[in-house]
A protein has these predicted regions:
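Inter-Walker segment of RecA-like/P-loop motor cores
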Residues: 93-141, 145
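SF2 helicase catalytic motif II
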Residues: 129-133, 138-188
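Conserved Walker A/P-loop ATP-binding site and its immediately adjacent core
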Residues: 65-89, 108, 129-130, 256
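Interdomain hinge/linker at the junction between the two RecA-like core domains of SF2 helicases
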Residues: 190-192, 196-244
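Conserved pre-motif I regulatory segment
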Residues: 2-38
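C-terminal helicase lobe and adjacent C-terminal extensions/tails of nucleic-acid helicase motors
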Residues: 237-244, 261-271, 275-290, 294, ...
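Divalent metal-dependent catalytic cores for phosphoryl transfer on phosphate-bearing substrates
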Residues: 358, 364-365, 567-750
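Walker A/P-loop NTP-binding motif
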Residues: 33, 45-64
Length: 750
């Protein structure tokens, strides 16, 4: 980077953050993000992960810089804080309209706006469970038919950044495997990964780029000898004795249960004390974090959620023995900025269940000595090797998103589906989180003793609280409720419903949550419900749209989208445009035309694609073919007409229901997704001059033949799963945009 560009980048960073960048950050802006970046705790990893990429994307080398940055963090609280910080940077730089910013963590992960603008430069900040599950085509708190869109975008034109590697667990190996599979199988546009670490370099990631910037602050190491039989009480007394009046003491414990107990003991002793962990509603979490910034003479008791990214420093740190990388992160919260020139104290103890012997030996050898961040970073402590991530065969098996049971919803709305029965080949939990880290999302509402009312809104946004699945599963039967995906009614959750990312309701009168303590399953105190927020205004199609018009408009949108995205080979570009032009041919089927006209006055003649929503909601209708999928008919027409297999697949896949495996739903057999063998379709003539004659549909051999053809596309070396999903995404986005041309607020909902 020339001196002029270096000065320009310094101005860029100062405008965003108010601080001058460290030299290593300027180097990243000049050379691009490396594979591995090692920076001491407090050395500016977040700035290094975001602003050099942003500068290269918008200023110096946009054509060589992936258009999406995905910043993956291990905790919801860290993701929230980072999301706010990055938003402030974009606002100060005047880029909020040019660069999208989205949060993929907790309940916010269900917001899918980032999928609708694949051509826009964007930043996704998320937790590893929500992001990696989507990269494996099994997104937590996501709707299965939307999975190919998330997958296609995350594996295309994306710069991944994984922070705090020591907290990723199995997700670290998964992230490495996914990058290697992208390199091996190919993507539509370059996709890269940077891993950042504050400690030693993980094996197999190559040579690290070393960053510096953290002050050479001092911490003195000392051991606390606590009796295992009275551990919590002794630890509480030790914290009280170690606290220096007028300063902050930070206590990091390995167990949420022990953190609750020590917090309660300190509070009972009259100490000013805050409890921080991962299981708070958003507003309460933000309030507590703000309280830590405004106080100095207090104690913060935390779980390992504090290790990563939280901008918090204390004069005294009390920590349980933990793996070395975690210990280094925790020590980084002691005298973090050198605000105590005399140094801080790191006091460690062995929990009742024991700890890592190698870490204990290093700490014992440095008893009473002052250590710096550089010494901690340079230490060589052997740590367990994480289990391997998914292989090629696993990745290919996950590409099939067909439900393994008949319980998924067939609605095209973006809502939760009922649980699928996953086979070992397609379950992804083991590649993402330790079992103890899996969470569901819970909201508390007040309702009648019989349960939630039929019109009770779905939980969303600020009222949702992540809850450990293990503790949720211990609640009495009938405590948790969810909306059934098939009939839309609230019902008690079954054990199979308690899955990562599930959205559940609990009765506020039964307790389980305290605003200053978060998820507290043994608390009987009624929970003050958090406002669910205003319901979204109802939108829908406000005019009749003919089939020919919709197909042409979708092809037009595909042209526009392709013009704004990286150059694809001509054959793939043509396949996307043709699939967009043909995707809804199956709407010519009588079952769909009858559905569009049913209950609506004065429908026009001719084949329709969209119906006009009037001033009043329609009465409920019972479809004669409840599982009907028009895109299956599109596939049958194109296949029988001898069209290109890729075009046929992309047209069929445009709602995410007809992709690899196609089977009857519920009790509909011998129908197949609402289509009967021998059904007739009328002739279709498009304004382009293309004609599709009337046909008799045959479905007897379709499922097996279709799966074989779809798998051949997935396994084609010139396509592969990543490119194929990206092409699916382009057709779907073009369809959404053409439909949006005719959408508006429905007056009856205002």
């Amino acid at each position: 980077m020339t001196a002029e560009l270096t000065a320009e980048f310094e101005t860029f960073v100062r405008t965003a953050t108010g601080h001058t960048p460290y030299p290593y950050q300027a180097r990243l802006a000049a050379e691009g993000l490396p594979t591995l970046l090692r920076v001491p705790t407090g050395g500016g990893k977040t700035v290094a992960s975001v602003l050099p990429w942003l500068y290269r994307r918008l200023v110096t080398v946009p054509q060589d810089t992936p258009r999406r940055l995905v910043l993956v963090l291990p905790q919801r609280s860290i993701a929230d804080q980072t999301f706010v910080r990055v938003g402030e940077w974009l606002e100060r730089l005047g880029l909020t309209g040019e660069v999208g910013l989205h949060l993929l963590a907790g309940g916010a992960a269900q917001e899918g706006g980032w999928r609708r603008k694949p051509e826009q430069s964007g930043i996704l900040v998320g937790t590893h469970d929500m992001v990696l599950s989507r990269a494996l085509m099994r997104g937590y708190a996501d709707w299965r038919p939307m999975a190919p869109v998330s997958y296609g975008l995350l594996h295309t034109d994306t710069q991944w950044v994984f922070d705090e590697l020591h907290l990723l667990g199995p997700a670290l190996s998964t992230s490495v495997r996914l990058q290697r599979l992208r390199d091996r199988l190919g993507t539509a546009a370059a996709t890269r990964t940077m891993w950042t670490s504050s400690t030693r370099d993980p094996a197999g990631l190559g040579e690290a780029v070393l960053g510096s910037g953290a002050p050479a602050t001092l911490r003195r190491v000392a051991r606390l000898d606590l009796p295992p039989g009275d551990y919590v009480a002794a630890l509480t007394e030790a914290v009280t004795a170690a606290h220096v009046p007028g300063t902050r003491t930070v206590v990091v414990l390995n167990s949420l249960e022990r953190a609750r107990a020590v917090h309660a003991g300190l509070a009972a002793a009259g100490r000013e004390v805050l409890l921080l962990h991962s299981y708070f509603r958003a507003a309460d979490r933000h309030r507590l974090l703000a309280a830590t910034e405004g106080q100095r003479d207090h104690v913060v008791v935390a779980t390992p959620a504090l290790e990563a990214g939280l901008d918090l420093s204390g004069r005294t740190l009390v920590t349980e023995l933990a793996p070395w990388a975690s210990l280094v992160q925790r020590a980084g919260r002691c005298n973090r900025y050198g605000e105590h020139p005399e140094g801080g104290d790191v006091l460690w103890c062995t929990p009742p269940e024991g700890g890592d012997p190698a870490t204990a030996r290093w700490l014992t050898a440095h008893e009473g000595r002052a250590v710096t961040p550089a010494q901690l970073q340079a230490a060589r402590i052997d740590e367990p090797v994480p289990p391997p991530g998914p292989g090629r065969a696993d990745l290919l098996a996950l590409f099939d998103t067909a439900p393994d049971s008949d319980t998924d919803s067939d609605s095209d709305s973006d809502t939760d589906s009922a649980p699928d029965t996953e086979t070992p080949a397609t379950a992804v939990d083991r590649w993402i989180c330790e079992p103890s880290e899996l969470t569901a999302l819970v909201a508390w509402r007040a309702w009648e003793p019989t349960g939630p009312a039929e019109d009770e809104p779905d939980p969303a946004g600020a009222e949702l609280c992540p809850v450990p699945l293990g503790e949720l599963q211990q609640l009495p039967a009938g405590r948790a409720w969810l909306r059934d995906a098939l009939d839309g009614r609230w019902r008690p959750a079954l054990p199979a419903d308690l899955r990562p990312g599930a959205r559940l309701l609990l009765d506020a009168r039964s307790g389980g949550y305290l605003p200053d303590r978060g998820w507290t399953p043994r608390s009987p105190a009624p929970v003050p419900p958090e406002a669910a927020g205003p319901e979204r205004p109802a939108y829908g199609c406000t005019t009749w749209v003919s089939l020919d018009q919709h197909l042409q408009e979708t092809a037009d949108e595909a042209h526009l989208l392709l013009a704004a995205l990286p150059e694809l080979p001509a054959a793939l570009r043509e396949a996307v445009i043709r699939a967009a032009r043909y995707h809804d041919l199956g709407k010519c089927h009588d079952a769909f035309q009858e559905k569009l006209r049913a209950g609506r006055p004065d429908p026009p003649d001719g084949l329709l694609a969209k119906s006009r929503n009037g001033a009043e909601p329609l009465p409920p209708l019972r479809p004669t073919r409840p599982y009907f999928r028009h895109e299956l008919v599109s596939a049958l027409l194109l296949r029988h007409g001898g069209h290109d297999p890729l075009v046929t697949y992309l047209a069929a896949a445009h709602h995410g229901h007809v992709r690899i495996t196609v089977r009857p739903r519920g009790d509909e057999a011998p129908l197949l997704l609402g289509v009967a063998d021998g059904d007739r379709t009328p002739p279709v003539e498009l304004s382009t001059g293309e004609r599709f004659p009337a046909r008799t549909l045959h479905i007897a051999t379709f499922p097996q033949e279709w799966t074989e053809r779809a798998l051949s596309l997935r396994d084609d070396p010139d396509l592969g799963p990543f490119r194929l999903a990206f092409l699916e995404t382009l057709v779907r986005v073009a369809d959404w945009r053409s439909s949006a041309r005719h959408d508006g607020p429905l007056t009856w909902a205002l």
